[in-house]
Amino acid sequence: MSKRFSLSILVLTIGLAGCGSVIDDPQQAVKERRKMAVVLSDVGLGDQSFSDAAMSGMSLLREKEDWFIDYRELSETKSYEAAFATLAKQQPTVVVGLGFMGQADLEKVAKQYPKQQFALIDAVSELPNVLSVTFKEDEGSYLAGAAAAIQSDSETIGFIGGMKSPLIEKFEKGYRAGATAINPDIRVLVDYAEDFAAPDKGRELANAQMKKEADVLYAAAGLTGSGVLEAAEEKGNKAIGVDSDQTAIAPDAVMTSMLKQVDLAITKIGDSVKASGLQSGQIVLGVKDGAIQLAPIRNANFTAKELHRLEQLKQEILEGKVKVQ
């Protein structure tokens, strides 16, 4: 089922799952507006992470830039390829794919529609009709690791990734580098769930790490990460969320979240395709662009000196003094 937004809808709540309403005068509006069609990540809406953040960006485009928005979830189409093909047939201004897991299918469909503009978030394509947008997740994870090291009493912290891949390893490497910048002797436990939609697996891995004395956990694992945050809360430990502010998942445990402004990526794509014709290339977003940052520190007794140290590290990133590889 196609999901479209009415101009009258100005509030988009996290966790939206039902079908949206059709715009007031669809025949007229479709002709006059640019249209963005998005295939959400495999977990879809309600992940309190990647897809929800993208939806926020789509809402901003619709509200401020007068774009017409359409999207698909895999629960409807059963495959990325079917979703991309369905949307490409509609000839929107741009078809957007979220996440590296859909890259192969996006590129397959993009080759079939060489005059259609596509965009890919979180991976890089070499095709002439695919615009790529990536993030410097290692920068934000560096700050997350520093915060974890400051908070940790056991000098052992944990990282749980959704799937071992070059993208998620950027989170891990940044986290480790930030932690050792604060405490060179800190121990960083690492596990991969190999699933972005398995909260129970996240909980299992979190409990195993906490048995090894990890008292701060960082999850870059989509919906799997919610199990990590909840497990940390149950044991009275701290956790760091990802992509969006995930405090609501475990209010007593989440001390901050590494914010990855996927909504900004969506609006950047809109601005780029609006400004010029068919294009490729790569847009890279980091701390300097306001696309990567930490949510406010909470549930942690940081001293003024420790908070200042975090700000210093952020400034060093802005000045190019810290480069996480």
Where are these regions (language model features)?
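Hydrophobic alpha-helical segments within soluble ligand-binding/sensing domains
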Residues: 134-154, 258-276
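C-terminal motif of bacterial Sec signal peptides marking the signal peptidase cleavage site
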Residues: 15-18
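Bacterial signal peptide processing site
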Residues: 20-23
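Extracytoplasmic "Venus flytrap"
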Residues: 31, 36-57, 61, 70-80, ...
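Periplasmic-binding protein-like
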Residues: 92-99, 119-121, 213-222, 242
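An alpha-beta-alpha
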Residues: 58, 143-185, 190, 282-302
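Hinge/cleft segment of the Venus flytrap/periplasmic-binding protein
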Residues: 274-325
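Flexible loop/hinge segments that line or gate small-molecule binding clefts
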Residues: 111-135, 243-255
